[in-house]
């Protein structure tokens, strides 16, 4: 009788072990717990123990512990062999192969698979073949991997039609499709990859395999990243992450999520975040002992360093990754790492007139290796580099061969690939002496970039997209400068300048959720500030705010873009007509030299200005002395000394930037800066005194915005015309944030300027929601508040209101905006300048949303000292003057008063935008 219970326990243990094995793909943590429970029983018979060890090993591998999994599965295979469980032993070897691969034992992994395949038949053998395909993919043997997947699929498809459930393997088919999908992406077969991944997801859903469902979403996100649809990729990554979190530790069950997100961040130009993600992925992989993942993460980190211009760090990480790949027999990945290393070497000397000859030979070898291993996109990029270097060395034969190969992908693949191919084609035509053909190729490449940018809804992603077309614009500008035609130089200088501002604004998705995140961030930031003021530790509030910033950025990036690209081209004839008697100055930087195109009375002239390095130093001196002036206002003699130093340095900068232009006297001027020139306090330069001065991010944008008016009718309106801004029917909002010296008095004085029809928000009434509502219901807004420009994260640049900080993200939620905004808030006009003179900051965000003119400071300003200047500006606006004219007259009055405070305020304020006096409210 004693044997009865034991006899019954044997099949129960086997059933429990089998259940644990079946659970691995769905919930590896629970599968591990169940397998351990079976193994703890001394009565467990050999087959049940083998299956439990198999389940435990697979669960360990799924939770990113490949070393532990290898040891467990090795013991399982040994035990199965000793008890003559041949089928179990063979299938365990299939699982063991991936653990061996992950821990660097590539040859052993392939031997285990060979042994397994010989011992298996039917769908079990197909699983072994699938596993070999996955191993080949990890080795970089992409075509071999595809062949194995296709061979295994045939067996699994045949079994799919049988009525015998034991002969079918729908889960095996789903896993095959999910593994083949990313391989097809790497081979450039995006449509076929999408079919695989969608079918894999449907099968996984039907089978109730939650972990596999998450992985199909993860791989679809990878596909959309390569396709260039970043908002869709972000949404899919978010969905996959939520599914992973519902199952267990994301870091353990999805160790590649970090590296794949890093690739997305790189594609979006978010370099700092990408580098952080790659560094974290390296650390996670080192902890887990997954040598393959470590090497791949190092390669991504190298790419992040390369994109950031940190060439030494990029080369070091790439070389280290190449060594790791070589040690594990991954020759294809060695080529990929060498590709990144040589990119760092080439880009580091790209401005050199004569690059070292050795680089061409090295690059040619790497391009051939990349092509042989199936890395087509990377081979194209290297061939483009080879062509450029060969042109510099006069080896046109080498250049033509390399560029012809690189140009083959003009009409297929991702946006980045097509842009690179058009660049190669332009270079090839340039070498052949076909300059018109080269320009057509450049314009085609930039059109691809415009279409790609239009897909993006988030301002941040749109601004970063210009980096993909930097080389195209550089070559186009070079051709124009060589030919010396000022109008062509202006057109090419404009072609990528602040192009993101030409697109219609996109309201971020999930508005209620984003609003909640912003409110919580405001509270956390406020808590940190109050703790600091009270002498307490602000670390808790800062940490919460930092976490919320990441969530806000992620949510805002989900916005869908427009259906069609905006036309960013500059029509010089239309621009000349709309300028009237004004003068346009567009600054252009090329190879370290600053020049300018001056457009006046329909005639364009080209002026050389000087060394960009010297000018940048002068700008730093001017800004430093302006800040010192602002801080010393009210301190008697020290303020006077600071004012004189500021005037002296401003005179030097005026001599460098304005004197060479030889501007006609008395004309209004529109200045289009570039690079560091966006930080210039232009109204401090004497050559621009006594002029209506407008700053615009782009001549084409200024022209297009002015074109939406009805000149010359708008120009002829008298000050008392009811359609003129400031007339009695206009909706005017007056806002003064907290802790402003004289803020309440300033609003009271402005009420007298505009009369009773004003909405006033002062002190506690000036909350974020109240100010946003006022923005949506006003034609003109005056918003005085303490401002803060966030160089580390420009979208969090802010204005301090009664209940916290108003950010660029808040502004982007507006449905309509005023025509004109006056923002006497420190640094409100300061911007972060990205590739292509794309701008991120408070004032640039307002222009994107439809505000036509912004008057704001590009530096610090003293609070109460600005009141006389601001009042004078509003008096001019009330009389119907254009914003630039109102500011110019107010500046003249301030200079006449002659005090240091007047000088500090008048020098910092700028009129930015289209200088538009139209009174209709702009829809965002």
Where are these regions (language model features)?
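Residue register of alpha-helical TPR repeats
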Residues: 13-14, 51, 91, 127, ...
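Single-residue signature of alpha-solenoid repeat helices
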Residues: 31, 69, 109, 145, ...
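Amphipathic alpha-helical segments of tetratricopeptide repeats
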Residues: 36-40, 75-84, 114-121, 150-161, ...
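A domain-level signal for caspase-like cysteine endopeptidase catalytic cores
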Residues: 197, 675-677, 708-788, 823, ...
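Caspase-like cysteine protease fold
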Residues: 789, 794-817, 863-924
């Amino acid at each position: 009788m004693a044997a009865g219970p034991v006899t019954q326990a044997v099949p129960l243990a086997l059933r429990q072990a089998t259940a644990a094995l079946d659970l691995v793909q769905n919930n590896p943590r629970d599968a591990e717990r169940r397998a351990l429970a079976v193994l703890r029983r001394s009565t467990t018979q050999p087959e049940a123990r083998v299956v439990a060890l198999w389940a435990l090993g697979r669960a360990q591998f799924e939770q990113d512990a490949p070393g532990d999994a290898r040891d467990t599965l090795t013991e399982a295979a040994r035990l199965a062999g000793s008890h003559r469980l041949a089928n179990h032993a063979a299938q365990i070897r299939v699982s063991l192969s991936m653990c061996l691969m992950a821990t660097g034992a590539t040859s052993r992994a392939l031997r285990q698979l060979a042994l397994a395949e010989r011992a298996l038949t039917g769908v079990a053998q197909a699983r072994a073949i699938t596993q070999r395909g996955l191993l080949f993919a990890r080795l970089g043997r992409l075509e071999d991997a595809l062949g194995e997947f296709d061979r295994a699929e045939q067996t699994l498809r045949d079994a799919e039609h049988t009525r015998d459930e034991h002969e079918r393997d729908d889960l095996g088919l789903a896993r095959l499709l999910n593994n083949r999908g990313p391989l097809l992406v790497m081979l450039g077969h995006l449509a076929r990859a999408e079919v695989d991944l969608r079918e894999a997801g449907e099968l996984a859903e039907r089978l109730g395999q939650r972990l596999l469902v998450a992985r199909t979403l993860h791989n679809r996100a990878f596909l959309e990243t390569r396709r260039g649809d970043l908002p869709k990729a972000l949404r899919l990554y978010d969905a996959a992450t939520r599914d992973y979190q519902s199952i267990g530790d994301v870091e353990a069950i999805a160790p590649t999520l970090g590296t794949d997100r890093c690739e997305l961040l790189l594609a979006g130009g978010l370099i700092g975040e990408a580098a952080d993600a790659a560094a974290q992925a390296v650390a996670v992989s080192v902890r887990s002992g997954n040598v393959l993942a470590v090497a791949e993460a190092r390669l991504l980190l190298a790419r992040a360093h390369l994109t950031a211009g940190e060439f030494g760090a990029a080369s070091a990480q790439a070389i280290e990754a190449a060594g790791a790949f070589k040690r594990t027999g991954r020759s294809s990945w060695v080529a990929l790492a060498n590709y990144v290393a040589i990119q760092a070497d080439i880009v580091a000397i790209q401005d050199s007139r004569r690059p070292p000859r050795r680089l061409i030979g090295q690059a040619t070898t790497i391009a051939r290796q990349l092509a042989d291993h199936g890395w087509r996109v990377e081979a194209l990029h290297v061939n483009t580099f080879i062509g450029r270097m060969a042109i510099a060395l006069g080896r046109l034969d080498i250049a033509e061969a390399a560029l012809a190969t690189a140009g083959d992908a003009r009409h297929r693949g991702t946006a980045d690939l097509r842009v690179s191919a058009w660049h190669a084609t332009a270079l090839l035509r340039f070498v052949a002496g076909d300059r018109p053909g080269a320009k057509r190729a450049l314009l085609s490449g930039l059109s691809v970039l415009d279409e790609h940018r239009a897909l993006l809804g988030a301002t941040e992603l749109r601004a970063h997209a210009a980096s993909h077309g930097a080389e195209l614009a550089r070559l186009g500008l070079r051709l124009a400068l060589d030919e010396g035609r000022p109008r062509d130089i202006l057109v090419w200088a404009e072609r990528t300048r602040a192009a993101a501002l030409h697109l219609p604004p996109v309201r971020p998705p999930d508005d209620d959720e984003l609003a909640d995140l912003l409110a919580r961030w405001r509270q956390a930031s406020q808590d940190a500030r109050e703790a600091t003021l009270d002498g307490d530790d602000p670390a808790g509030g800062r940490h919460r705010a930092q976490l919320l910033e990441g969530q806000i950025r992620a949510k805002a990036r989900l916005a869908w873009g427009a259906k069609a690209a905006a036309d960013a081209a500059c029509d010089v004839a239309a621009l000349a007509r709309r300028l009237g008697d004004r003068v346009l100055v567009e600054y252009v930087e090329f190879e370290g030299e600053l020049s300018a195109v001056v457009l006046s009375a329909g005639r364009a002239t080209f002026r050389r200005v000087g060394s960009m390095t010297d000018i940048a130093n002068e700008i730093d001196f001017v800004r430093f002395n302006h800040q010192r002036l602002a801080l010393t206002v009210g301190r008697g003699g020290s303020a006077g000394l600071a004012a004189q130093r500021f005037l002296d340095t401003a005179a030097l900068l005026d001599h460098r930037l304005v004197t060479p232009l030889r501007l006609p006297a008395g004309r209004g001027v529109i200045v289009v800066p570039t690079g560091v020139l966006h930080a210039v306090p232009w109204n401090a330069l004497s050559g621009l005194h006594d002029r209506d001065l407008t700053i615009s991010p782009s001549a084409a944008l200024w022209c297009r915005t002015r074109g939406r008016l009805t000149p010359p009718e708008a120009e002829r309106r008298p000050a008392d015309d009811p359609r003129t801004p400031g007339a009695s029917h206009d909706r005017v909002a007056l806002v003064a944030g907290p802790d402003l010296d004289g803020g309440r008095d300033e609003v009271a004085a402005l009420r007298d300027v505009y009369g009773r029809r004003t909405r006033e928000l002062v002190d506690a009434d000036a909350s974020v929601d109240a100010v946003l509502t006022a923005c949506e219901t006003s034609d003109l807004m005056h918003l005085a508040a303490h401002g803060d420009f966030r160089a580390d994260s420009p979208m969090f640049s802010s204005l301090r209101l009664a209940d916290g900080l108003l950010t660029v993200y808040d502004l982007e939620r507006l449905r309509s905006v005023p025509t004109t905004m006056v923002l006497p808030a420190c640094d409100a006009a300061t911007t972060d300048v990205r590739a292509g003179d794309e701008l991120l900051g408070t004032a640039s965000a307002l222009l994107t949303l439809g505000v036509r003119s912004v008057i704001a400071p590009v530096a610090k300003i003293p609070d109460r000292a600005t009141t006389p200047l601001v009042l004078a500006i509003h008096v001019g606006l009330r009389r119907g003057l254009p914003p630039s004219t109102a500011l110019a007259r107010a500046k003249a009055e301030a200079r006449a008063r002659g005090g240091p405070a007047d000088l500090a305020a008048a020098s910092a304020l700028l009129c930015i935008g289209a200088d538009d006096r139209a009174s209709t409210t702009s829809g965002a």
